[in-house]
Amino acid sequence: MSSNKGNGRLPSLKDSSSNGGGSAKPSLKFKPKAVARKSKEEREAAASKVKLEEESKRGNDKKHFNNKNKRVTGAGGQQRRMAKYLNNTHVISSGPLAAGNFVSEKGDLRRGFIKSEGSGSSLVQKGLETIDNGAESSENEAEDDDNEGVASKSKKKFNMGKEFEARNLIEDEDDGESEKSSDVDMDDEEWRSKRIEQLFPVRPVRVRHEDVETVKREIQEALSEKPTREPTPSVKTEPVGTGLQSYLEERERQVNEKLADLGLEKEFQSVDGKEAAAELELLNADHQHILRKLKKMNNKPERFMVFQLPTRLPAFERPAVKEEKEDMETQASDPSKKKKNIKKKDTKDALSTRELAGKVGSIRVHKSGKLSVKIGNVVMDIGKGAETTFLQDVIALSIADDASSAELLGRVDGKIVVTPQI
């Protein structure tokens, strides 16, 4: 037991290790490795060894690539390099671009493909010879080729992407068929036409420039019918000042003369005739509007029109009656008519008194369409007032002491401004 028993504590590890025996030193779990520096001779030997390994690996890769591009031909097992233009290519056996049935003349694996149909054509033969020449040049370039001096010109292949001149093809074909045809006797034009037929089997119709007019005329005579009526007349040009323009100018001159006779420049205090005509048009439009409003008020009794009068009105005077003097003169000459004249006078006075109740003037409509107001013996002009955007009602108020009342008479429909003629 440890000495800490009396204290009530657990024994510590140090106490237990010290009691159990000698203290063991902790050992490292990962020990560093001491790397010794190589000498110069060892480093050079290692570098040369790595270099040799890389060169051997590069040679193996090159040999593998060359073997991949070679194909075994015949029983001798000779390896020949395949032409570069045939890499990543394949023969189409069906479809519009199919190569058809292919045969080989010698039966070896490295053989040219020749279509059985039309294989004797000079174009095919020329292409095969060119391919063989290209294959021979590619064979000379190969480093690991065993048979460098062997040339297989008899091999026949298709031209895959190479071009030839048309003259060379035609010359080859002419050389091959010299025994069967008489091409020697052909002149330049026939030889050129034959070459064009070989290149372009379907010849387009060509027309010389000097024959264009003749061809057009011949086609028109063959397809078009003769006209049965006269040709369409051309557009007729007339001077601008005739017809309607002259009539308008005459009417404008007449209107200006009438305006000058009326003397509207002084009435409207305008500068020129155009301004006077514009003022006259506005005045006529106002009078027509007022006349329509008055007719509408006559049909609808509950409609009223507001008249804006000047602040000072002329004194209303009863018109003098000349008939009274004439009646007094005729009383002595014709006593039998005295009673009738007296009755007529009484009736006129009675009517005049009734008409004057609440009436201060009248609106007159002239033959020209102009409107005017006559108040007493004074004639005034009228014009259209400003329209309101809200409703206005006319109300009659009674302010009697015993009982006051208000009565709605109707609605205001328009406004007229009365101006005196100065």
Curated annotation (Swiss-Prot):
What is the similarity comment for this entry? Answer: Belongs to the eukaryotic RPC4/POLR3D RNA polymerase subunit family.
User: Where is there biased composition of kind Acidic residues?
Assistant: 138-148
Q: Tell me where in this chain the PTM Phosphoserine is found.
A: 137-138, 178, 182, 224
The record describes the protein's role as: DNA-dependent RNA polymerase catalyzes the transcription of DNA into RNA using the four ribonucleoside triphosphates as substrates. Specific peripheric component of RNA polymerase III which synthesizes small RNAs, such as 5S rRNA and tRNAs. Essential for tRNA synthesis. The RPC53/RPC4-RPC37/RPC5 subcomplex is required for terminator recognition and reinitiation.
Q: What Gene Ontology molecular-function terms does this entry list?
A: DNA binding
* Miscellaneous notes: Present with 998 molecules/cell in log phase SD medium.
| Motif Nuclear localization signal boundaries | 25-29
Provide the Gene Ontology terms for cellular component: nucleoplasm; nucleus; RNA polymerase III complex
Instruction: Name the UniProt key words of this record, in alphabetical order.
Output: DNA-directed RNA polymerase, Nucleus, Phosphoprotein, Transcription
Instruction: Name the species this protein comes from.
Output: Saccharomyces cerevisiae (strain ATCC 204508 / S288c)
Subcellular localization? Nucleus
**Compositionally biased region (Basic residues):** 28-37
User: Which residues lie in Basic and acidic residues bias regions?
Assistant: 38-64, 160-170, 219-229
The subunit structure is:
Component of the RNA polymerase III (Pol III) complex consisting of 17 subunits. Interacts with RPC37/RPC5. RPC53/RPC4, RPC37/RPC5 and RPC11/RPC10 probably form a Pol III subcomplex.
Annotated region (Disordered) at: 1-80, 115-190, 219-244, 318-350
Entry coiled-coil feature ranges: none
Record PTM Phosphothreonine, positions in chain: 228, 232
Which GO terms fall under biological process for this protein? termination of RNA polymerase III transcription; transcription by RNA polymerase III; transcription initiation at RNA polymerase III promoter; tRNA transcription by RNA polymerase III
What is this protein's record name? DNA-directed RNA polymerase III subunit RPC4
